[in-house]
Amino acid sequence: MGLATCLSLQSCSRPQAAASKSADPLQGKLVLTGSSTVAPLAAEIGKSFESKHPGVRIDVQSGGSSRGISDARQGTADIGMVSRALKPEEKDLKGFLIAKDGVTVILQKDNPVKSLSDKQIVDIYTGKVTNWKQVGGKDGTITVVNKAEGRSTLELFAHHFKLKNTDIKAQVVIGDNEQGIKTVAGNPDAIGYVSIGSAEYSAANKVPIKLLPVGGIAATTENVKNGTFPISRPLNLVTKTEPQGLAKEFIDFAQSQQVSDIVKKQNFVVSK
């Protein structure tokens, strides 16, 4: 009798457990593609969202802001990730600000150069200056690290310094911020430019790089926040149409105060 009672209780408890798992109305999968700057942030937000909604999976893939725009338009991604403002020809898309960031120049930590003027940066990237001793550093051939086409970090950098990508004479072309940081950290003669958030996070975790000021303004998250840093940008999620259902719930969550600590931990600026 006891065994029968036990079996009966077990059989009764299973539907209840199943019911509790399916009680959350949010179910399904979202695919996010695009900016390598936004991707780590979106992935962490995604993990938090998944923990609240066990029936949901968030798949985050990087590849550049151009990919985020293209995939959102074509419907190959539910949400695109774009680390810049939308262009006039992209206004058919819906944009949602989730954080702010800046772009700055980085050097290997042991490089004695502490700052570069805008003109010196332009001269280095256009091949007019090729040795560190020409800008007050040690004798050493400069390794110029540039971003690949389609990266919004490149667009922002080039726009600020009034450069065309065809003007830039680079020895190394990289994709995401992590590649750029690793390349510069491993080469005392390298110069690159990356997301301030990514660079600050790496430097705080003992990666041997340093962030140079731009226009005399220190490259810090705080200066992006107070609006004094000259190269700043919005970090956006984009959709083809007004989001609904699971996509809307995720975007609302990504814009909420619930993710403020995640944004700050990634060294970005909270948007609200």
Report residues per predicted region.
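Exported/periplasmic ABC-transporter solute-binding proteins
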Residues: C12-S66, S70-T76, V82-K272
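Sec-dependent N-terminal signal peptides
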Residues: M1-A4
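C-terminal motif of bacterial Sec signal peptides marking the signal peptidase cleavage site
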Residues: L7-S11
